[in-house]
Curated annotation (Swiss-Prot):
This is Sensor histidine kinase Hik2. Residues 11-131 form the GAF domain. It comes from Thermosynechococcus vestitus (strain NIES-2133 / IAM M-273 / BP-1). Belongs to the chloroplast sensor kinase protein family. Keywords: 3Fe-4S, Iron, Iron-sulfur, Kinase, Metal-binding, Phosphoprotein, Transferase, Two-component regulatory system. PANTHER family: HYBRID SIGNAL TRANSDUCTION HISTIDINE KINASE C, TWO-COMPONENT HISTIDINE KINASE. It comes from the Bacteria. Autophosphorylates, possibly on His-161. Member of 2 two-component regulatory system(s) Hik2/Rre1 and Hik2/RppA. Transduces PQ (plastoquinone) redox signals to photosystem gene expression machinery during the adjustment of photosystem stoichiometry. Reduced PQ suppresses its autophosphorylation activity (i.e. kinase activity is higher under oxidizing conditions). As part of a two-component regulatory system with Rre1, controls expression of sigB and several other genes in response to hyperosmotic stress. May transfer phosphate to RppA in a possible Hik2/RppA two-component system.
Length: 385
């Protein structure tokens, strides 16, 4: 059972809907959360834009399964984006692991949604899903007995770090939007307001991280299960690629993508792959100076598909590399003046460990500079935790 959404979560939803309206020209949007996690469908609106919009015009198709935990064999019913029976309407599930917590419904009257726009909506849905988990855990804490302190701190630190990446991507999209809006454009004040609220959210996340609030798991002491399923790599990585391209333009860097055609599917939890690659890309951008290059490359070999995130930054000293995946370790970067928590690589490695996978680091990568992180995923067998 889900707790009712807090006022803070509802306010975050409204801010994200305003961003979508202003940047993508949506005519109406809504965020629904499930009121129960059982076999009876029950959806409750949390935020609607514009506020006077009729919920009937943003109806959830009856074909959408009930809000519940989705077994691996049924995951095909919950694609990242669902085109409804209504014209120009998208429905994106707010998913955390295999749990459908709610849906984001977006409607636009005069033109269909482009692939890049759908990728931006997926970023918004991902942000709202993680924010919903944080909100639920906060409420769970106030109604539940204490859990072991170290366990709660570690799980909450991980979630805060995972939330920073999609919020940072939204911040980048807003900055790009402001660069393209004329000073007298009627939508500029709204975009500036969204930019300020996004910066405020990032500051709050950093403040919460430093305070290390004690927040337990959504379902108590038992973690939600991982489940492997066949993934289309190009489609799965599209939201991350779109965000990286926007960030490269904003920061004066080059982003290179190398994805060969006709890749075989791999069996891996979609959320796991996106979190791992998202953390690697975030690190690559942070430690690559202006004018540098960041790359994402997929290479098919036997018996594994190799995914590599590389950069032309300053590199990682050999003596620091054995400790890269320790929680909180930043090495020489701790004195660089670049913000960081030292959690990204540790989280990535922890997410991969149940599948028997791990990251491999190469530094220097190009000449005497740069760093590359490679993930080898067997594609001739199903990978299960």
């Amino acid at each position: 059972m889900l707790w009712p959404a807090s006022e803070e979560f509802a306010a975050l939803c409204r801010t994200q809907l305003e961003l979508v309206v202003n940047s993508l020209g949506a005519s109406s949007l809504a965020v629904y959360l499930s009121e129960t996690l059982n076999d009876s469908p029950s959806w409750s609106p949390v935020a609607v834009y514009p506020e006077a919009a009729s919920l009937l015009s943003l109806a959830i198709p009856p074909t959408l399964p009930p809000p519940t935990q989705v077994p691996e064999t049924s995951l095909s019913h919950y694609p990242q984006q669902v085109v409804s029976s209504l014209a120009n309407q998208l429905i994106l599930p707010l998913m955390y692991q295999n749990w459908v917590l709610g849906v984001l419904v977006a409607q636009r009257q005069h033109r269909p949604w482009l692939a890049a726009e759908q990728a931006q909506l997926q970023q918004v849905a991902q942000t709202l899903a993680i924010a919903c988990v944080l909100d639920q855990r906060q409420q769970w804490l106030s109604h539940s007995p204490a859990q072991p302190l170290d366990q709660r701190q570690q799980r909450f630190d991980d979630l805060l770090h995972q939330l920073r990446n999609p919020v940072a991507a939204i911040r980048t999209f807003v900055k790009l939007l402001l660069k393209r809006l004329e000073p007298d454009h009627k939508g500029r004040p709204l975009a500036e307001g969204i930019a300020k609220e996004t910066e405020r959210l990032m500051a709050l996340l950093e403040d919460y991280r430093q305070q290390r609030n004690d927040i337990p798991a959504l379902t108590g002491s038992q973690p939600l299960p991982l489940a492997g399923k066949p993934l289309d790599l190009a489609e799965t990585l599209l939201p991350l690629i779109s965000a990286a391209q926007a960030r490269a333009e904003m920061e004066g860097k080059t982003f290179v993508v190398e994805i060969p055609p006709q890749l075989p599917p791999i069996w891996l939890e979609e959320r796991v792959l996106q979190e791992v690659v998202g953390n690697l890309l975030d690190n690559a951008f942070k430690y690559t100076p202006k004018g540098g290059t960041i790359g994402l490359r997929l290479m098919l070999s036997s018996p594994a598909l190799e995914l590599t995130v590389w950069d032309t930054g300053c590199g990682i000293p050999k003596e620091a590399q054995p400790r890269l995946f320790e929680r909180g370790y930043r090495g020489v970067q701790a004195d660089s003046g670049i913000e960081g928590s030292g959690l990204g690589l540790a989280i990535a490695q922890d997410l991969l460990r149940p599948y028997g996978l791990s990251l491999r680091v190469t530094s220097p990568y190009a000449g005497d500079r740069g760093t590359a992180f490679t993930l080898a995923i067997p594609w001739q067998m199903k990978v299960e935790p």
